[in-house]
Structures are given as structure tokens and as C-alpha cells.
Amino acid sequence: MNRKFLPLVLVCLAFCAGAARAAFINGQNYAPLADWAGANGFRIIWPAHNEVVLTNRTSRLVFGVDSAQAEINGVNVRLSFPAAKDRTGALIAQFDLDTAIRPLLSPSHYVEQKKITTICLDPGHGGKDSGNRVGFHYEKNYTLPLAFEVRDQLKKLGFKVILTRSTDTFVDLPVRPAIANSRGADLFVSLHFNAAQSGRDEVSGPETYCITPVGASSSNAQGEGGDYGPTTANRFGNKSLLLAYQMEKSLVQNLGAEDRGVRRARFAVLRDAAMPAILIEGGYMTSPVEGKKIYDASYRKQMASAIVKGILNYQRLSGPVLSPAATGMSTVIKVKTPG
């Protein structure tokens, strides 16, 4: 063989070997986790049959086979597609590497250093729309005072705050992000409380939603009509993910609550927001324990403080959010097995 063609042949063999190990599952390209781990300096361990752990000097990632539920530095994050496994090892959807893992590991590549001055708070429901109802408790009656408390704390820190409603009035869903857009808000935060189906009063904990990536199904797909196309909010998708991550992390840590995770949805109040936007479900009114807390003003004040801390943590992003120097702890990314 001509020596000058040998490097080209070796490159081709290496590329073909990598391509052969890739997989196409349910319409998605999956990458061998071992290849991605090696390229990013991770060591792989299999502590259980359906769980794979990736570690390096600063980070720890755990993926569960057939699970889309991830845990990142102690915070649950729902992936768009489940991790998989073949005879060569674990596989991860390239889509999730691009839209979740990479942004969360390297936020400085996705968030420019822009000063946040104006925040739009959206107290969920109002007027004829009472939201969730548990006994004589209506969701709309708790989202508004929570918004007032968050507003007051933010204003003390020098932020300008916009409310989509300040009384018990009905505001159409599309109008809410329109208010934020017209007033030049830097962030949009919609405030809600959750309710579980009958017989599931054990469910508790906050959830934080951001816009679903284009082409993926939502964690909560109700009312989306199968439209997976781009929205205005998708222009800010990575920033919204990072805001949601910091918010969920702050809520769980500061409230000592069960972590229901960062999730994706095309909620009407998120779709048209022309800035990073999230929707917070602050807890479950149907939980006998958590419900009583939600109805208590002192707990809502504590929750408001956690929300403010989440916003401040997002604002401070200037390097890897999972840097030990920044967090004082090692990175954890975890995907649990179903059940």
C-alpha cells in the first residue's frame, strides 16, 4: 500500500468503527456513552445491571437504561428520550446531549453576560379561572400572594418587577407573555401550585417547566395538539433550561422538598415569551402535608426567598454551573431506572 494513503485509511477505519457503534432508535440518533465519556474525560462504572455511572475529577453522571429521568448535581432533569443499551454498552440520544447535557455542563457557552433588571411574575389563574381546587382552597388565591412576596423581595434587591395580574382577575393565557414582551422583561416566571389525581395524595414537591425543544415530546403534553414545531420561546431554550435548573435546585434545597424535577412543556404562557421563561409548580395542594404548607403565609415567604435565590443563581452564571469551585461539591448527573 502506498504510504501516503495510510493515514487516510486509518482515519476512515476509526470513523467507520465509531459510526458502526452508533444506533438509530425510534427515529433518534444514539451515541455510545463510552465514546462520549472518553472524549470528555469520564470513567465508566456499572454499579447495577441497568445503571451506568460516569465520573471524572469534578463530575459524576449516572444513566439508567430505558429511563428519561435524569438527576444533575442533585436535581432531577427529564430528558427528551430514554437512555438505551445494546451489546456494546449504554447509549444516549444525541438530541439530549445537544439540548440538555451540554448546556447544563457548560452554561457559559449558552448564557451571555447580560444584566437582568426587569422580571415579569405571572401569578397563575385568577378571576373565573380558579385553577386547582382542594376543598375550599383555590390555587388562584395562593399564587397571587406568592407573587407579591417574590415581588417585594426582588424590589428590595433593586429589580424592576412586572405582574401580569395584581388582583383576582382573569387574564387570557396569551396575554401574559405578551405583557412581559411589551414591557421588555428579561425573565418570565409563572407561578402555580399542583394537584395530583385522586388516590395519589402522597405526591409532593416542586416541578419547574421550561419550553420543550423543537421536535421532542413534552414531559406534560396535555393540550399541545401534536405540534412539535418551533415557538418564540425556543430561541431562548437553553437559557430557559438553565433558569429552570437553578430554580428547581433552589426550591428543593431551601424548602427541603421532594424533587419533582426540571421538565419540558409547551404551555401557552411559555410558548410566546421572548425571553428566558419558566413555569413553577410550587408543590402539591393535594398532599396532606405539603398542602397545609402552601396555605401558610410563612411557608410561601420561604418559597419566595427560594425563588429569588434561583433567579440570582441564574444571573451569576459565568462559568460551568457544575464547577466544584462554584458549588463546593462534585457534579452529579443521574438517570434512574423506571419504577
Language model: regions and residue ranges:
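A broad, structure-centric signal for solvent-exposed, well-ordered loop/edge residues
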Residues: 8, 38, 61, 70, ...
